[in-house]
Amino acid sequence: MLKMESTQQMASSIINTSFEAAVVAATSTLELMGIQYDYNEVYTRVKSKFDYVMDDSGVKNNLLGKAATIDQALNGKFGSAVRNRNWMTDTRTTARLDEDVNKLRMMLSSKGIDQKMRVLNACFSVKRIPGKSSSIIKCTRLMRDKIERGEVEVDDSFVEEKMEVDTIDWKSRYEQLEKRFESLKQRVNEKYTSWVQKAKKVNENMYSLQNVISQQQSQIADLQHYCNKLEVDLQNKISSLVSSIEWYMKSMELPDEVKTDIEQQLNSIDVINPINAIDDFESLIRNVILDYDRTFLMFKGLMRQCNYEYTYE
């Protein structure tokens, strides 16, 4: 005999359809919010969360188990259905269900969803009207049952609350604000005046310093011009002195070797740098004095050999 599992297949189909609906709801919400997403990533994340919730809460196994019981009853096996009926009517099962309901209520209370909110959400639902800002409030079956049991009251009383109006003296408030504004204005003006005076003093000092710098620059330029002129004059004087000595040497009756030696020493004088030229002149004068001293000693020795005497006049 062919086994019938249509109820289990239907339950499995409902679960799969619920998962697809969850994926569509998630992607459409992201599109409405303008958030770009990867469909495969959203699909994977929703599937992982959906499978975890369905398995961890036991909802999936509960639905498939009840569907299997119905299929067994349809196949003529009523033992499982009888056991489920006995289990559902057992006092321990009822106590367990009450315990689960109480846990859920306490969980909702811990999340800030109090009894009033739970009752109102259970008694009413809101139906939006397309194209309009208004909506329709619908009563649920629980609300209808409460009306039938007389558990709904209409409070027509209107409590008129007297609105307390504080009397404010706007004139005194304005005067206080005006005084504060004038005081603030005066402080700002004083600070601004002090800043202007400091700025003027800084500008005066800066202009004075600029004048001093300009005068010093002018004096430095004059001194530089004088130094350059003095250096040129010294160079010309040294060059003229060298030429004069050279001309005077050539007019003397000296041997050619002596003239050549003195000429080489004159040519070695640095006419560009006056300091070096003075050192060269010093060396030349020392050499001349040394030659004169040697000549005098030779002349003195010669006169002694000839038995002559000499005197300075």
UniProtKB/Swiss-Prot annotation:
Location of the protein in the cell: Host cytoplasm
Main location: host cell
Region annotation Interaction with host EIF4G1: where it falls in the sequence: 208-313
Residues annotated as transmembrane: none
Keyword Nuclease: no
HAMAP family in the record: ROTA_A_NSP3, ROTA_NSP3
Homology family: Belongs to the rotavirus NSP3 family.
Subunit structure: Homodimer. Interacts (via the coiled-coil region) with host ZC3H7B (via LD motif). Interacts with host EIF4G1.
Protein name (database record): Non-structural protein 3
